[in-house]
Amino acid sequence: MARSVAFGVAVSEEILGDGASVPIQGGIADGMATAAALGFDCVELHLRNPTEFDATALARLAAETGLRIAAIGTGLEYSLNGLSLTSDDPVIRERAAARMRQHIDLAAPLGAVVFLGLIRGKCGRRARLADCLDRLAEQLAPLAAYAAERRVPTGIEPVAYYFSDLLNTTAETIDFLRRPGLESIGLLLDTHHIHLEERDIEAGFRNCAGRVTHVHFSDSNRRYPGAGAVDFARVARALDAIGYRGAVSLEILPSPSGEEAARRGLARMRELWVPRAGTRAANAPTTAGSGL
């Protein structure tokens, strides 16, 4: 029986520094070659500007390295470009939405998930939280339709309180996605955030059955799995229980170095799945959440 999940790692074009949770930085081509040499099945690409990349060239690079491009991350649009779907400035909101469409366009021919984390923005004031969520839903509904038309799976990420005050728990996120026009959006689940925000990390994953489009493995201290307090065995059990068949990707700090963090993280993931399964994963993404 084939292993149920594909092992992935985050790669960026830019050098983001030691404080960024992307272990392989400084070039997509070189980063994918490194990921392949380390033994990963797939990568997620963290892109500041999707229009700088050609899908055909990326597909060729994937074929050359034997890797699948499992996902495209949009967080750099917020952290480096200052774009937010809930900004008070309507011009910034529209620029953020336009960039999301460009990420979706790039992902479509690659069969990649597009996930949404920090680009949701922050509200900043509890009294305005309902208005901020309404604004986010207003921006996401047309993007969900745009992604669904192009058959691009997507996921919004519940994030810890120190990242954003919008959608911290799985329950909040699932409830938000019940709004009209958002039903096709899936969830990206990150063990670091779930560990901080959920009373029971395994239950947090199980509650999202049928909606999970991508998974991040990151320990409680944002380092590689095994460097902190997250019980990854419980997470692996939960993912198997809900029938998740997508990528499990390392979005971790590059400590003690990017390659070493990735190597140690991959070793821990193999401990969790390979003894119970056996062979290299079939690189087939989950079909849940074909919209943003």
Please annotate each region the language model reported.
Residues 5-11, 43-45, 69-74, 114-116, ...:
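Hydrophobic faces of well-ordered beta-strands that scaffold small-molecule active sites
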Residues 35, 43, 62, 96, ...:
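Conserved, mostly hydrophobic/aromatic
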Residues 1-108, 267-292:
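N-terminal pre-domain/capping segments
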